[in-house]
Amino acid sequence: GHMISFYAFGVVLGAPVMALFSSRFSLKHILLFLVMLCVMGNAIFTFSSSYLMLAVGRLVSGFPHGAFFGVGAIVLSKIIRPGKVTAAVAGMVSGMTVANLVGIPFGTYLSQEFSWRYTFLLIAVFNIAVLTAIFFWVPDIRDKAQGSLREQFHFLRSPAPWLIFAATMFGNAGVFAWFSYIKPFMMYISGFSETSMTFIMMLVGLGMVLGNLLSGKLSGRYTPLRIAVVTDLVIVLSLMALFFFSGYKTASLTFAFICCAGLFALSAPLQILLLQNAKGGELLGAAGGQIAFNLGSAIGAWCGGLMLTLGFAYHYVALPAALLSFSAM
């Protein structure tokens, strides 16, 4: 749990720092530096011999997370023709969905059969492959919209980016208020066995992949705002259905799939909305979105846990989850 917290702290700390002090470099060089930090962080974690090294490894690994997706979205907005940017960002975000579907089960297998060190060593090696791909295939472009340090904050005078930050935070909090307790929810309320959880996690991982792809497809027909609002509505309804029909296995699986699909269907449209409403401070805006996303995860898990602390059964975590998602909508 502490290692997860160190990673999350790295995300929150690193995103704005990288956004503010990277305007003098090209976007390609920023991406290369961020991936190098990933390699270093995972290498430190892999070969650590003390708790301090473990903590430093996770902190360094989390540091580039938020900025990487922010810079990546800006690069795509500059090289993809208008009207296709949301779909392109959805393609970038699909990396996270594939990680949930394939990477986590495979990493768990390596940890159980060999050692957790092999999992993080593989991640470091994969980061090197990403580094190579960026070096050869990403064009060397600059974000000419970046002004002085003070000018990068000007977009925050408008309420629009704050509303998008709030929507990102509450939307993620809503899903994670329930998803953080998916195992006991499925086992103790829906009646699944512990051995079924691998299948269930792969199913919701597939939902994340398909939700992200669907969002990208719809971006050619609808605005990012409309996609985000409708997706939040679908998440609210699916969370309410999870509360009322949690005792039925088929219903639980169906609405869990829909809920997780909705979570990643939100990612690309919200990222594009931030870029559209953060003129002059796109890097800072995108980084702020990642902070809101991670803060939402923590708030959601706390809200779900509060219901359990008050003595309610596991399916009651879906109620604050639905309320948080409704706030996002």
Question: What do these predicted ranges mean?
Answer:
Residues L13-S49:
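Conserved MFS/SLC helix-loop-helix module at the cytosolic interface between two early adjacent transmembrane helices
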Residues A15-S26, G211-P224, L308-T309:
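Helix-to-loop junctions at the C-terminal end of transmembrane segments
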Residues S26, F47-M53, G191, F245-S246:
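Helix-breaking motifs and short loop linkers at transmembrane-helix boundaries and internal kinks
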Residues G41, L52-S61, T250-I258:
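Paired small-residue
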Residues M53, P82-G83, A87-F136, Y181, ...:
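Helix-loop-helix hairpin linking two adjacent transmembrane segments in secondary transporters
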Residues G57-G95:
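Cytoplasmic helix-loop-helix junction between adjacent transmembrane helices
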Residues L225-L270:
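C-terminal transmembrane helical hairpin of 12-TM major facilitator-type secondary transporters
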Residues N277-A313, A321:
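A late C-terminal transmembrane helix in Major Facilitator Superfamily
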